[in-house]
Amino acid sequence: MSTYRKTYKNQSKRFNNGNNSNSTSTELTNLVEMFPDWEADELQGLLSENDNSLEIVIDLIVNNKVSKWEPIKKEKHKKKEHKDDTTDSVTGNANGASNSGSSNSTTASGDRRLNNKAKASTSSRPPKRQQHPNAAHKKNEKTERSKASTVSTTTTSATSSVTKESVPPSNSWAAALSNDKPKKQETKSEASESIPSSNDGGDAETVPEVEQAETLEESHQEPENVEEPIESVSEQSQPENTKPVLKSAAIPEPKQGSWASAIAPKTKPKPKTVSKPVPQPEESKPEEHIPVQEEAQPVESVLEDKPAVEAVQPVQPPVEDEPVEAPAASSVAAVADASFSEPTASSIIDQQPQVVLPTTQQQVDSVGISFGSLSVDAGEPKEAAEVIQDETISEQVQPEQQQQSQQQPLQEQQRYGLYNQQPTQQRYQQNNYQQQGQYSKQQQQQLQQQNTSQPTQQQTTIRLLWSISTTTISSTNSSTRCSIWWLSWILL
């Protein structure tokens, strides 16, 4: 086909005028010198389309309005080539019919038609010549890319298989050492495979070139294909870099299935570190509870002291307890008559245990402290009630002192009378018993003094607070005074 087209092109050139041939030859030479990348056939086609004007062709090429046949624009150029072929065939048939119909015309008209045919052939057929070398280039490129893709897929699959083989850990240290050697051999074989694959890609690119422009086009295409083997080499370098990491991870960490894991002593210190922070909160808890127990001890001692005081009271004879209860009942009746708001307070006093004051403590009737009243007019009866309460406390203390003074001489007389009658052994036992009794009495007296000192202190503090509250709240309502009064009696 190419030989036929060349001969036909030469025949068409013969029909052209001498001036046209000279002009096209000079313009072609100029364009070839200016654009060595372009082929002469392509430049001639552009000249014929643009009426042999250099300026228009140069503008088209410089502004990239016209481009060469390149492998980047594959599909578009193929479609255009098919369209050009169909248009050329249609125009050729039309020209043949017109030539057969106009055979009887003049020679001048025949020459004009031949010139038109030559122009149409020059404008339409140069792209046909471009089809075959470009198609060959495209086929070669497709084969190259398919080969490169297959090589890259094989290399990636090989690397993935190698990594998969290296990932599963071995059950013993001997298996880990044995697996290292075939890995090195596999990497060497992969590197040897990648090198010939890149060489094959280079050989596929070396296609017999017919023209100088084709060599330049292939030189632009080669770096694109060279990038693919570079990527495959980089992919091979990655597993090589990761393999020493796998070695270090496989050797010092034997799994449970190996005998080395059973002998390894590294598992012992781990539970110690876990168990240390656990007892710390347990130790802190008893430390927090210890002061609570210490605080509870004095409360228990006070509770134990109170029944001891109560135990002393039954020692007294029942006959002498009656005058003690009589003034208490009379005092309660007097307090009930004095004011209407105090029966609840008197009931609280009756419920509380009797306070036994020590003999050495002086009686205090009044210290110049006066309590406030619930109302402005009811000040005198409250003062009278307070004096009665003080008198009842003093009356309770006096018979108790008399009872103790009467009991002491009776006990001494009994001891001295029995001392002469009993034998020596009984005397020794009585002496021990007397010493123990005296010691117990001394302890009881000390406890009584401690217990009695506490309520007296509370009473004095409450009276002081009451006097302060009455002075500060002289202008307030009666409800606030009542609340303060109730609190003071509850504290008693």
Swiss-Prot record:
Gene Ontology molecular function: DNA binding; ubiquitin binding
What are the Acidic residues biased-composition ranges?
202-216
Q: Name one Pfam family in it.
A: CUE
Biological processes, Gene Ontology terms:
DNA repair
Q: Where in the cell is it found?
A: Cytoplasm; Nucleus; Chromosome, Telomere
Post-translationally, this protein is described as follows, namely:
Ubiquitinated. Proteolytically cleaved by the proteasome in response to transcription stress; the resulting N-terminal form constitutes the activated nuclear form and the C-terminal portion is degraded.
- Broad class of where this protein is predominantly found: cytoplasm
Instruction: Tell me where in this chain the CUE domain is found.
Output: 23-66
| Start and end residues of each stretch annotated as Disordered | 1-25, 73-309
Q: Where is the composition biased (Basic and acidic residues)?
A: 180-191, 282-292
Q: Which family does it belong to?
A: Belongs to the DEF1 family.
Q: What does this chain do?
A: Recruits the ubiquitination machinery to RNA polymerase II for polyubiquitination, removal and degradation, when the transcription-coupled repair (TCR) factor RAD26 fails to efficiently displace stalled RNA polymerase II. Also involved in telomere length regulation. Binds DNA.
The name of this protein is RNA polymerase II degradation factor 1
- What gene is it encoded by? DEF1
